[in-house]
Amino acid sequence: MQAFDLYAILPELVLLIATCLLLVASVYVPERVTPTLGVEQDVFHTPRGVGFVYFFTIIMLVYLVFAFVGRMGDPALVAMNGLFQSDPFSNLLKACSCIAVLISLIYSKQYLMDRDLFRSDFIVLALLALLGQFVLISGANLLTLYLGLELMALPTYALVAMRHNSEKSVEAGIKYFILGALASGFLLYGMSMLYGVTGSLDLIEIFKVVADPRVNHLVMAFGLVFIVAGLAFKLSVVPFHMWVPDVYQGTPTAVTLMIAAAPKLAAFALLFRLLVNTLLPLLGDWQPMLVLLAVLSLVVGNVTAIAQTNVKRMLAYSAIAQMGFVLLGMLSVFDDHAFSASMFYAITYVLTTLGTFGLLMVLSRKGYDCETLDGLKGLNKKHPWFAFISLVMMFSLAGIPPTVGFVAKLGVLEALVDAEHSFIAVIAVIASLIGAFYYLRVIKVMYFDEPEHEVTVSGSGFAKGVLSLNSILVLAIGIVPAGLMSLCLDAMRRTLLGS
């Protein structure tokens, strides 16, 4: 292994070694407090063993965030004999993924403790999934992409089914596993067809062969269908979306957040690496597929969400529609502004999702999960600050100024108009107007309905502070979006140019 290989994969090595050490340590430390064992608690009010794992994980994730941010100005590196690439695009997405997992753990701690689920295996599985996201985001080879995808997916299957005494959780885990395996099979079959035609697993070599007009494009187009189908499942877009509502609703909210936030960034990276970096010469084949998937997702997601009374199920259909917007940004022909708009949308959607599910966990307590609209009734009368946080998140998801969601949607719509897809932009606007109904309905029940039962707030003061900062960021980036936009544009431009 050469020196620059080690430098390129150093954060991944740190995460891998630390996760393995935590996995071994978790075998020898007490997991929970029981009357018979009388396990002593630490300053975090958790069993000492789990508290150590939790604290060490938080410190490591903070280090990784700074490590990736510090690499933003580095030139692109291809390491490990072409298997792995480190570029501004991957460094930005990996930093955002670290932040997403970090915030998810902070929000989840009290929620999991109240349900006797705050165990070291939850943290280790989350870290393994994060490692898979890193490998997937930096994949420069079909084999690396697939291994990263599976390393990300397998721990999430276990997370979804971790509440084994709940029928809904087990059912959601089985559905997620079976459909996820099917989607992985689609993706692997499509990749094998690409390999059969091009004779290479390297993305750069595949691009060169695909760009050759003498190559049989019919076979590649056939494989492309399977690749897009696999990507559609990972992005949870129509018609490969049927698992999303059941998984969101059937799992503990902390687990829902783990699969609803950071993995979306990795799925976006997979979409970009395969379709733009590798299969851009087949634009005429995959662009109509993305148009169909995006429009169906916008319409089906927003219309179906109107009928939902379970907030998590509503947010599942909302996620389907939001991913439709991400796909719309990929329709422009080699336009770095359009691709960066799509990247900006994915990052800001994850930021808003963190705040939304974080609020649901703060409003939950031992023996009660805040998951329905009835549970939010009258929130403003009891806890006006948290009602305001929810208002900010709903405004952002709906795309209402001055939140970041408005800026993100506007950027994608501008890219569509510039690419002469005005009709699709009109459909997207109409779908967003439909979607605004159920977001505003949440605000209505919080501010104008009378509470049906006692509304309480749980969670540590630190978690509440992070949630408040989360909502402030959603507003601040919406008012001053230039910083994050320029980061996305610079990362996308340098990645496309290979510098």
Swiss-Prot record:
Superkingdom field: Bacteria
GO biological process terms on file: ATP synthesis coupled electron transport
Lipid bilayer topology: Multi-pass membrane protein
Transmembrane segments: 9-29, 49-69, 88-108, 122-142, 143-163, 177-197, 218-238, 252-272, 280-300, 314-334, 343-363, 386-406, 423-443, 472-492
Pfam families given in the database record: Proton_antipo_M (PF00361)
Subcellular location: Cell inner membrane
Catalyzed reactions: a quinone + NADH + 5 H(+)(in) = a quinol + NAD(+) + 4 H(+)(out)
Top-level class of the enzyme under EC nomenclature: translocase
UniProt entry keywords in alphabetical sequence: Cell inner membrane, Cell membrane, Membrane, NAD, Quinone, Translocase, Transmembrane, Transmembrane helix, Transport, Ubiquinone
EC number: 7.1.1.-
Keyword Transmembrane helix found: yes
Main subcellular location: membrane
InterPro entries: NADH-Q_OxRdtase_suN/2 (IPR010096), ND/Mrp_TM (IPR001750)
GO cellular component terms, semicolon-separated: plasma membrane
Keyword Manganese: no
GO molecular function: NADH dehydrogenase (ubiquinone) activity; NADH:ubiquinone reductase (non-electrogenic) activity; quinone binding
Subunit structure: NDH-1 is composed of 14 different subunits. Subunits NuoA, H, J, K, L, M, N constitute the membrane sector of the complex.
Family: Belongs to the complex I subunit 2 family.
Function: NDH-1 shuttles electrons from NADH, via FMN and iron-sulfur (Fe-S) centers, to quinones in the respiratory chain. The immediate electron acceptor for the enzyme in this species is believed to be ubiquinone. Couples the redox reaction to proton translocation (for every two electrons transferred, four hydrogen ions are translocated across the cytoplasmic membrane), and thus conserves the redox energy in a proton gradient.
Protein name: NADH-quinone oxidoreductase subunit N
Gene: nuoN
